[in-house]
Amino acid sequence: MKILVDENMPYARELFSRLGDVQAVPGRPLPRDLLAGADALMVRSVTKVNADLLSGSAVKFVGSATAGTDHVDDTWLNANGIAFSAAPGCNAIAVVEYVFSSLLMLAERDGFQLRDKTVGIVGVGNVGRRLDARLKAWGVKTLLCDPPRADRGDAGDFLPLETLVRDADILTLHTPLYLDGPYRTHHLVDASVLDAFADGRILINACRGPVVDNAALLEALQRGKKLSVILDVWEPEPELSTDLLARVDIGTAHIAGYTLEGKARGTTQVFEAWSEFIGTPQQVALSSLLPEPEYAEVTLTVPLDEALLKRLVHLVYDVRRDDALLRHVAHQEGEFDRLRKHYQERREWSSLHVICADADSADCLNALGFTASVRGAR
């Protein structure tokens, strides 16, 4: 069997070669002639999978090593007998840690304590619920908005978006992109929402670019709207607005989910789905793939506070690096995708073992996603 894999899917060649002949291919653009004779196609979010790409091909399985699936026309795939599997939740921890790192950076810069803020989370799926749990572990008040879950009667105190816009100091978006329908999220944050969002607040988009009307956001900032803005996703990509980038506080190249662990989870999830599809199910232990991190262990001699948490977080990942990289090259054609293709290895907080002086600090760090223990009790 011939299996095409995105050249930027870590461990893909290593894993899929167990089950067939593997060819690494570019994700954007993906030339149609490379599909000749292929039985399966493994992609990331940069590849639009639809009739234009696959009609007339022999592909019978598509795997997307991503949490989101708006780049895949799964209706067309189903109608044409092509199986599809994605990797829901694979990069959720990475996105949560991106948001947390960004907020701690703003807190240090602007002189506030994150625990004193109220965070409104829009979209309480794989990312949103994990972010909610970690913020609460740090003592941060959260407000949740998720109309589909509210209408289904899911457990949770869900509020209208208008309430979050009114009451939250920080609004962070973690929804799928729905272009229409009762739960439309395209331009969910538009000019009217921006007008209602008070000055001095923080807006974060790390889900899909068009969830925020980028033109309306740029216009609001140009008119003097006093918002701190964190954007990892843009409208459109990869041709983002450099004028908007110049006005946001943190801007990155759609890399919030790009931890080594998150990428590896995505690859292993679609590999396991493919192995089941062909009748040879296999399970992969993530730990068997990952290398030793650059920083594996650190010892604390004092109790944990927000300044110390920020230092631990930024020891593993400092979002300012990615912000600086995008600003340096954003005006150059093709550099947005190049940054993503050649992204520097980034680990999750769990890769760092923190030896604490007290049990309360260790308990808190474990709840936040680190690997922590008390000195002498390891």
From Swiss-Prot:
Residues annotated as the enzyme's active site: 208, 237, 254
EC numbers for this chain: 1.1.1.290
Species this chain originates from: Pectobacterium carotovorum subsp. carotovorum (strain PC1)
Keyword Cytoplasm: yes
Protein name (Swiss-Prot/TrEMBL): Erythronate-4-phosphate dehydrogenase
Top-tier EC class: oxidoreductase
PROSITE patterns in UniProt: D_2_HYDROXYACID_DH_1, D_2_HYDROXYACID_DH_3
Lineage: Bacteria, Pseudomonadati, Pseudomonadota, Gammaproteobacteria, Enterobacterales
Entries under CDD domains matching the protein: ErythrP_dh
Transmembrane segments: none
